[in-house]
Amino acid sequence: MKKGEVYTGYVESIGFPNKGCVYVTDEDGERHRVTVKNALPGQKVAFRLTKKRNGNSEGLLKEVVEKSEFETDPACKNAGKCGGCLYPGFDYEKTIEIKEAQVKKLLENYLSDDVIYDGIKSSPVCDGYRGKMEYTFGDEFLDGPKVLGLHKRGSFHDIVDASDCRIADEDFGLLVSHTSGFFSEKGVDFYHRMKHTGVLRHLLVRKAAKTGELMAALVTVSGKDTMAGLDSDEIERLCNDWKESLLSLKFKGKLTGVLHIINDSPADAIICDRMDVLYGKDWFTEELLGLKFKITPFSFFQTNSLGAEVLYSLVRSYISEDVKGGKVFDLYSGTGTIAQILAPAAKKVTGVEIVEEAVEAAKENAKLNGLENCDFIAGDVFKVLESYADSLDSPDCIVVDPPRDGVGPKALLKILNYGVKHMVYVSCKATSLARDMEMINAKGYRIVRWGMVDMFPFTGGIETCCLLERL
């Protein structure tokens, strides 16, 4: 096999989260294993060999030659085009079967025969479950049709129409199609990052699954740069006209906020230089397990609220006895969701989170829920545990819910040295969990109970929840 050549083969398995294992037999009859991202079990694919070193071969997917036996016609026209869903045409039960096998394989060295396994729990809703989406104004290809949608898989520039995205809330589709048509009719161009021309950048939408409250935020340049094509006053009038047009639409939910975010940053990200409320308010309320949470445009909050209830119920059940009247650390606490769910039974809960805005939101939400035994600290977990060593009471149990990269080695060692009887590790990336388990095991902890929650149906994502016990 030679680098740069195109080969075909069948995908025999898939590693977490999207690494298809393709086997190719060369002219000498020797079988070669090649990892091809986004190639799915059962498919026959064509790929270009991009890496061949020390027995590790990688390929770039070029074409699906034959569908998998597990595939049907996908419910989304952008299947395989956008970077969202990995399994758009697969039967849902098959997708969770694949994810379950992937995580079990990663954790096999840490799962003894007596470990209690609670299985993989499905999301209560599999379609339209996302309560937050960030859409980009752009063109389908260079100088192609203008569109409001999602980035094409593997592209920084090409955008695909996402008005009928399967996993986004139904109201988002109406917002996208209407907004796209509104500005197309007005002849307003999108912002060209390389040329610094144009006005429109993003559309940020959020919705609460329980309350139905809906927020729409349009992101544009300020108009201070004359190359934008419109000045600040013209952009302001345009945004107000857009707002008025939204108020005439019939949503399933209730539109409670229309915002205008100004962003002059060169980065292709939603960065807020200034935010104006055009209608309603710049926040809404979501409910989880009987508690209320105030959500702003930039709040970190689970995108699948109903799935989050399943996950957090699992966390609570694992340490319910330890929490009763005890002191709890909720590390990497985000907006303090887990902390507040555990707080009613605990003596005290201390949350640590590096994002200051999230900490302020956690404090505000705790006050909203009448919880006086929650304390939230802003800072890096390791540094906080080091600097507050004398003032923090030793915990009776610990919950860690780190970002995708997992817990850093210094922080993990510090956490394990508390020596609590039980810990819960919530992981959104099973490879990071498997890596961290090596140190966790070495420090005398083992998994005694675990389960998974499919928070993100049809994507490669899966949440894993492990109860760890000190031997």
Give, region by region, the residue ranges found by the protein language model.
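Short, conserved phosphate/pyrophosphate- and ester-handling motifs at nucleotide-, phospho-/glycolipid
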Residues: 42, 168, 304
